[in-house]
Amino acid sequence: MILIPAGPFKMGSSDKDIMWAARYFHSESLDWYRDETPLHEVTLPAFKIDKVPVTMRDFSKYQQATGQPPSREHDNALFNHPLQPVVSLPWKQARDYCHWAKKRLPTEAEWEKAARGTDGRYYPWGNEADALNANIRGKGDIYRYTNQGGTIPENVSPYGVMDLAGNVWEWTENWYQPHPDNQYENDLYGEQFKVIKGGSWNSNLDLARGSVRGKALPGQKKNYIGFRCVAAN
């Protein structure tokens, strides 16, 4: 696990940030970005986070230890290499794995600090929208689906955490609620969706920005959603 030191960081996006994203990625509307605002300071205690997403090998050990049969969704050679991220599991099963491992799911703020550091950068590696630094859709890289954790050396955060942009969206602990002082109404806020972060092999580089707030129903099983765990320092 990687230590994330205590202290403040910049979470979310400013109006300037979302206007940059909308222009750069040719978005038709700023409405897609409004839930990222405002840019605000959050202070967190120190914590530790998994260096890479939980793997199929890790998850298989959990299933064996708890007497669970192999999941039917994992009988797919495109996604079940031992070192690929485990995918196609609901939020509760991800949370249960973390508890079994004496860890927990990250909060949205913890995940975002681990990805962006303290300077409000757009991507783990900085502000440059370089599609070669992440496993995303449509750039013709060697990964058609998920990649084994840590195999793209450029995809590293200021703290040394890997694969926080692209590869798999990652479950967080939080419900999809507005950021403090967010000024925009959204009918999807509430206790219906869980926040997912990071983008995936099946999404574009815009959605791999650290401030992006993906959302998924807790019961959904998607081959582009995985997770990692955190623990107290």
Model regions and ranges:
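Functional-site microenvironments in short loops/helix caps that host divalent-cation chemistry
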Residues: K10, D15-D31, P69, H74-G214, ...
